[in-house]
């Protein structure tokens, strides 16, 4: 790409566990040809079917800390009561933005706040459930976490839902097609 390309648009997506972020992100990646999706780094174990370097970079807590110490993370946080750490490697995001590509970063609430603080030009999007009951049903229906983890995730979700007013955009994920369309407009639309 030539040096006179406009800098790409950075969209920061957050929302509670089981709101449908992964589904929406997957669809956006299919529909937006030049989209750069930032692969997060995490200390949690992979879920069935997840691939290292594709879904997440799965690392040890020690390796994660070394990335922080080296200044290689755009944002990071201890999440779910300190059970794990998650964050966004900075280098690939910066390179994609400079190349003029739309960039999608999926993070938790703390990560969204941190990126918005560092990059106030970013478009922050909160993906909300249609109701609390739907969110509980989605989270408990996964069958991938034990009861104590589900309880902790629901506590985290309550906190996250009260912070949605901090975001520039709130998209309710009642209909996946509409949610994808709304976020696609934010990513590549010329508002």
From Swiss-Prot:
<keyword id="KW-0418">Kinase</keyword>
<dbReference type="GO" id="GO:0005829">
    <property type="term" value="C:cytosol"/>
</dbReference>
<comment type="function">
    <text>Essential for recycling GMP and indirectly, cGMP.</text>
</comment>
<keyword id="KW-0547">Nucleotide-binding</keyword>
<keyword id="KW-0808">Transferase</keyword>
<dbReference type="InterPro" id="IPR008145">
    <property type="entry name" value="GK/Ca_channel_bsu"/>
</dbReference>
<dbReference type="Pfam" id="PF00625">
    <property type="entry name" value="Guanylate_kin"/>
</dbReference>
<dbReference type="InterPro" id="IPR020590">
    <property type="entry name" value="Guanylate_kinase_CS"/>
</dbReference>
<dbReference type="GO" id="GO:0004385">
    <property type="term" value="F:guanylate kinase activity"/>
</dbReference>
<keyword id="KW-0963">Cytoplasm</keyword>
<dbReference type="GO" id="GO:0005524">
    <property type="term" value="F:ATP binding"/>
</dbReference>
<feature type="domain" description="Guanylate kinase-like">
    <location>
        <begin position="8"/>
        <end position="188"/>
    </location>
</feature>
<dbReference type="InterPro" id="IPR017665">
    <property type="entry name" value="Guanylate_kinase"/>
</dbReference>
<feature type="binding site">
    <location>
        <begin position="15"/>
        <end position="22"/>
    </location>
    <ligand>
        <name>ATP</name>
    </ligand>
</feature>
<comment type="similarity">
    <text>Belongs to the guanylate kinase family.</text>
</comment>
<protein>
    <recommendedName>
        <fullName>Guanylate kinase</fullName>
        <ecNumber>2.7.4.8</ecNumber>
    </recommendedName>
</protein>
<dbReference type="InterPro" id="IPR008144">
    <property type="entry name" value="Guanylate_kin-like_dom"/>
</dbReference>
<keyword id="KW-0067">ATP-binding</keyword>
<dbReference type="InterPro" id="IPR027417">
    <property type="entry name" value="P-loop_NTPase"/>
</dbReference>
């Amino acid at each position: 790409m030539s040096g006179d390309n406009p800098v790409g648009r950075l969209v920061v997506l957050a929302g509670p566990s089981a709101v449908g972020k992964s589904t929406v992100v997957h669809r956006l990646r299919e529909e937006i040809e030049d989209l750069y999706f930032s692969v997060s780094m995490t200390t949690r174990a992979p879920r069935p079917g997840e691939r290292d370097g594709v879904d997440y970079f799965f690392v040890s807590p020690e390796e994660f800390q070394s990335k922080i110490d080296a200044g290689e993370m755009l944002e990071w946080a201890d999440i779910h009561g300190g059970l794990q750490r998650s964050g966004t490697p900075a280098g690939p995001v910066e390179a994609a933005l400079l190349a003029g590509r739309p960039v999608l970063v999926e993070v938790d609430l703390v990560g969204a706040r941190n990126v918005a603080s560092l990059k106030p030009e970013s478009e922050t999007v909160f993906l909300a459930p249609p109701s609390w009951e739907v969110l509980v049903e989605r989270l408990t229906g996964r069958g991938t976490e034990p009861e104590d983890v589900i309880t902790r995730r629901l506590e985290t979700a309550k906190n996250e839902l009260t912070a949605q007013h901090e975001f520039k955009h709130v998209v309710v994920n009642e209909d996946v097609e509409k949610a994808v369309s709304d976020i696609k407009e934010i990513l590549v639309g010329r508002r």
